[in-house]
């Protein structure tokens, strides 16, 4: 198969779909790999490294799209990239379609076969292609929140871990999954006063056993959430419903109960955000203030630590890419129901139910694509 990767063009996105090591694996299995010139510069991988791994360097993204049978990316294709997709071409990347009707319409119109990293599952029901970026984003959310709490950035002027004789910041993490766990781990490690909210008693039990006295856990209901948010210096939104738009758990009215200069970090912004007042921001302009509350809603947080993120991502995406290239997408999906769960759009149809439901579009079961 001819596999292609291009330079990411989303604002301040420095990751790349394939590392030179991944290219070497693909070419060693007999596949041709096309790499847009400069695609790996953000992780310190220059064209010569890709050439040594067996790739052919291509001058433009347009030529890569025109020649490749499968495009491997990191972030959802931007409008100019979507216009280059063609019927039957495979797109393998993060998509986050539920809150993005425009992208969904374009992918439907393209006729491409679109496999989303974030909905591929594993035997335990986890999301293995989302997990490493969730780990990165969870940890980064605390770094970003700590910076936003500084007075110069509009925050309360509170040090996350405090100092002897001065109380630490109160950090509230909404959601105890991969993002929430990593955020809580970082915040607790810095000495913050951490509370984690979740609706799953088993998750709360596991978190309680892990953190012991270093973090508190509370069941997530309206009353507990409102109380915790009102007391917080920093709130991390770490809620995920696989493939679906995130629920709006913190309302605009709740902001009025918060301390002025408190910070909201919405890690769920890729799926539309879990705060009513959230809208996507960029690394160039990461924050805005509503009712005195600082909002950090960068939609590609791991892009800021591109090298770590790219290698962590390739560790989990490459095996599936190899399988698709070796077998073709239909056979690969027939043999692996977990990879089949990643199929979001095929032949002009939405094949992931949560996306179809959220956008009010007709739903075609993914199984129809491999029948």
Predicted regions mapped to residue ranges:
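Glycine/serine-rich phosphate-binding loop and adjoining beta1-alpha1 elements at the start
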Residues: 2, 8, 79-169, 298-300
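An N-terminal-biased, well-structured beta-alpha scaffold segment characteristic
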Residues: 2-110
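General beta-strand structural signal in soluble alpha/beta enzymes
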Residues: 5, 34-37, 57-59, 73, ...
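Glycine-rich phosphate/diphosphate-binding loop of Rossmann-like nucleotide-binding domains
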Residues: 6-45, 152-237, 287
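Short glycine-/small-residue-rich Rossmann-like dinucleotide-binding loops
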Residues: 69, 75-76, 95-96, 221, ...
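Adenosine-phosphate binding glycine-rich loop
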Residues: 118-159, 269, 274-371
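Rossmann-like adenosine-cofactor binding region
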Residues: 209-291
């Amino acid at each position: 198969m001819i596999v292609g990767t291009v330079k990411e063009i989303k604002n301040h996105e420095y990751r790349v779909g394939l590392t030179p090591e991944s290219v070497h694996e693909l070419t060693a299995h007999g596949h041709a790999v096309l790499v847009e010139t400069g695609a790996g510069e953000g992780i310190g991988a220059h064209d010569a490294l890709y050439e040594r791994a067996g790739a052919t360097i291509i001058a433009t993204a347009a030529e890569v799209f025109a020649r490749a049978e499968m495009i491997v990316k990191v972030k959802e294709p931007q409008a100019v990239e979507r216009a280059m997709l063609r019927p039957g071409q495979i797109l393998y990347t993060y998509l986050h379609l539920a809150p993005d009707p425009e992208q969904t319409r374009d992918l439907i119109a393209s006729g491409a076969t679109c496999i989303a990293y974030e909905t591929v599952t594993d035997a335990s029901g986890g999301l293995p292609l989302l997990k490493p970026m969730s780990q990165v984003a969870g940890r980064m959310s605390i770094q970003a929140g700590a910076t936003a709490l500084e007075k110069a950035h509009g925050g309360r002027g509170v040090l996350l871990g405090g100092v002897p004789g001065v109380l630490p910041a109160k950090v509230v993490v909404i959601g105890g999954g991969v993002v929430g766990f990593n955020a809580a781990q970082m915040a607790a490690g810095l000495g913050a006063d951490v509370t984690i909210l979740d609706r799953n008693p088993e998750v709360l039990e596991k978190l309680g056993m892990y953190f012991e006295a270093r973090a508190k856990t509370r069941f997530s209901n309206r009353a507990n959430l409102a109380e915790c948010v009102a007391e917080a210096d920093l709130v991390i939104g770490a809620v995920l419903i696989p493939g679906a738009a995130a629920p709006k758990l913190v309302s605009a009215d709740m902001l009025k109960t918060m301390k002025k200069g408190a910070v909201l970090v919405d890690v769920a912004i890729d799926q539309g955000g879990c705060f009513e007042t959230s809208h996507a921001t960029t690394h160039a302009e990461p924050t805005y203030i509503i009712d005195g509350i600082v909002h950090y809603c960068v939609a590609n947080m791991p892009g800021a630590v591109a090298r770590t993120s790219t290698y962590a991502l390739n560790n989990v995406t490459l095996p599936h890419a190899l399988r698709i290239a070796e077998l073709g997408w239909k056979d690969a999906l027939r043999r692996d129901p977990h990879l089949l769960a990643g199929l979001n759009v095929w032949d002009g149809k939405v094949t992931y139910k949560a996306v179809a439901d959220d956008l009010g579009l007709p739903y075609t079961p993914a199984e129809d694509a491999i029948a």
